[in-house]
Amino acid sequence: MPWIQLRIDTDGPHADAISDQLMEEGSLSITFEDGKDSPIYEPTLGETPLWNHTVIIALFEANFDLSPVVERLKQLPCLGENFSYKIEQVEDKDWEREWMDNFHPIKFGDRLWICPSWREIPDPTAVNVILDPGLAFGTGTHPTTALCLEWLDGLDYSNKDVIDFGCGSGILAVAALKLGAERVTGIDIDYQAIEASKANAERNGVQDKLELYLPEDQPADLLADILVANILAGPLRELAPLIAEKVKPGGLLALSGLLQEQAEEVSAFYSQWFDMDEPAHKDDWSRLTGVRK
């Protein structure tokens, strides 16, 4: 069946109050969108911030009369008589199919492909990782994941052990194993991420070479020839001594999840343990690499 949606322009501080009003008016669902392409990075613990310019999208049944709803919304002090809104008809679609159509095989470097399970593999002779969007972050579409995958594609894995620090979906761990790593250890604070990594390793037939741990369960003497950490700038700074002690002398490091303006500071911080390279950039994001002293 078709639907009707009401789009309202507002700001972050008032979005929740307007959302509550719309639910009372009979909205079937509420969605918040960024109105001006201003993403939010590293919210504090327990915080769910919204954008300064937030678009609220309220969905109603097609025969719903929105005129009285709009009139009542005008009485809200945070909106007023001349608030900006738009009413649109929304056609009924196979939303699951439309969502799936947005994901395609992606190539990273010279030999690595990340392929959704419902797509045909473009190059059966390449290194192919089968991975679907799911519970944990990391499908290759984000610039930080792409930067890490491109770096992993260019490495020699002969007799090498790898640590994926903050493994999320397991995409980097599985890619390293498919590229030839001897063994990979994945560490994450989220049990759901551990389960997602395990499932993706099994799907790609590399589960026997992947060990997964919550931080409190990891071996005390864990060391690697290669460590990749795609998290955020704050945790990268806080965990730097712990990360450094897990890399063997002469071992390789890659850090991502940080913005370009954060790269210089984080690189300087890690330089006490590593000989750091020049950053690599993609869109607004950066990757740092280095060699353990």
Swiss-Prot record:
Gene Ontology molecular function, alphabetical: protein-lysine N-methyltransferase activity
Catalytic activity, EC: 2.1.1.-
CDD domains, sorted: AdoMet_MTases
Classification via InterPro entries: Ribosomal_L11_MeTrfase_PrmA, Ribosomal_PrmA_MeTrfase, SAM-dependent_MTases_sf
Subcellular location: Cytoplasm
One BP annotation, GO: methylation
Coiled coil: none
Keywords on record: Cytoplasm, Methyltransferase, S-adenosyl-L-methionine, Transferase
Transmembrane regions listed in the UniProt entry: none
Reaction it catalyzes: L-lysyl-[protein] + 3 S-adenosyl-L-methionine = N(6),N(6),N(6)-trimethyl-L-lysyl-[protein] + 3 S-adenosyl-L-homocysteine + 3 H(+)
Enzyme class: transferase
GO cellular component, one term: cytosol
Residues involved in S-adenosyl-L-methionine binding: T145, G166, D188, N230
Family affiliation: Belongs to the methyltransferase superfamily. PrmA family.
UniProt xrefs under PANTHER family: ELECTRON TRANSFER FLAVOPROTEIN BETA SUBUNIT LYSINE METHYLTRANSFERASE (PTHR43648:SF1)
Summary of the function given for this chain in its UniProt record: Methylates ribosomal protein L11.
Record's protein name: Ribosomal protein L11 methyltransferase
Organism per entry: Shewanella halifaxensis (strain HAW-EB4)
